[in-house]
Amino acid sequence: MYGTERKETQMEMTEQYPGYNHRVQYYETDQMGCVHHSNYIRWFEEARIDWMRHCGISYREMEKQGIIVPVLGVEATYRQMVHFDDLVDIKVTAAKYNGIVLEFCYEIYHQKDGKLCTTGKSRHCFLNKEAKPVSLKKENAVLHQKILTFIGKDVQDPDKKQDS
């Protein structure tokens, strides 16, 4: 895709996600010359889909199996402006997962100086075609395991007792 660069290297699922790179396009900027706030949410999605590919999860295959993943909520905090032709690195972390709901955290950094520009998070749930919640652990153990394998200790298995 023009204007975006994705690291094509297939990595072991246990390795940390290397992040997603994006070059800011002119159409993504506003009259003030900085990136319009709505584009950050789109970049989060691009990075999240790239994270899924890295994890060995095909969004298209999930949909073929009748699983959809709507956004429950998304937020962004803007710390530093980003401008046309800037290169940014987008880091994605799967922060919480219980088999039905998956929350991602995002950090966007300027490539030129490594400064943090934006932070954010998004919450998603797994549903069937009838829009009913799906427990991946019960309905799609392979997909559930891929998520657990990739994010490892960052995730709480819902069947494990948690400390209060």
Model-derived regions, located:
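Hydrophobic beta-strand-centered segment that forms part of the acyl-chain substrate-binding groove
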Residues: 51-96, 100-102
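Solvent-exposed, charged/polar functional surfaces in cytosolic regulatory/catalytic domains
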Residues: 50, 77, 146, 150
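Generic structural detector for well-ordered beta-strands
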Residues: 21-25, 77, 125
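A broad, structural micro-motif
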Residues: 35, 69-71, 117
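Catalytic strand-loop segment that frames the active site of acyl-thioester-processing enzymes
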Residues: 2-51, 164
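HotDog/MaoC-like acyl-thioester-processing domains
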Residues: 2-13, 18-20, 82-84, 95-164
